[in-house]
Design a protein with these regions (language model features):
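Aromatic-lined, polymer-binding surfaces characteristic
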Residues: 1-170
């Protein structure tokens, strides 16, 4: 998407379309794929990155109505999956923040208020569980809490609102 935006070379947008369609066709959600390509961490991240990339190529002409329907269908599958993927581990780890940030964005994008509310509830619980009294984060690695904090700040600042999602703030 970014290569298309920077160069306006249609080959980049066409390649993006082929890659995302190929991924959707070849990597369905199965019990087996939940252990690798469909781990909840990657599924949450994919929501954000796919929504961003769709926005980047939308003026290229490659985003046909058929491809858009296919992407939206796969994103609905992501949302349904993320709704049911929640356990004690996600309530304290960066995985919970990243997957629920994805669910939050999908809730806004697909106008599923119940997903948005659930994601916000889970993010709030994660924040209260994973941040210690001294301000340190449970993961004990600077990368994880910074990424997690950035996602929480985006949510708190309203970058997951319908207006900002449709305006390209993703």
């Amino acid at each position: 998407g970014k290569a298309w935006q920077y160069t306006r070379d249609i080959r980049y947008a066409e390649k993006w379309a082929r890659l995302i369609e190929d991924w959707i066709d070849r990597i369905p959600l199965t019990e087996e794929s939940e252990a690798n390509t469909w781990r909840s961490l990657e599924a949450g991240l994919r929501c954000e990155y796919w929504l961003r990339s769709v926005k980047l190529v939308q003026d290229s002409g490659v985003l046909t109505s058929q491809l858009r329907e296919k992407i939206d269908g796969c994103l609905r599958t992501h949302g349904e999956y993320l709704v049911r993927k929640s356990g004690e581990f996600q309530k304290i780890s960066n995985w919970g923040v990243l997957q629920n940030h994805g669910l939050l964005l999908l809730g806004v994008y697909l106008e599923r208020s119940e997903w948005t509310a659930l994601a916000l509830k889970r993010l709030d619980e994660n924040l209260h569980r994973s941040v210690m009294a001294d301000g340190s984060q449970w993961e004990q690695s600077p990368m994880y809490p910074l990424r997690s904090a950035a996602q929480c700040c985006r949510c708190a600042a309203g970058s997951a609102t319908e207006q900002s999602c449709s305006a390209g703030a993703l």
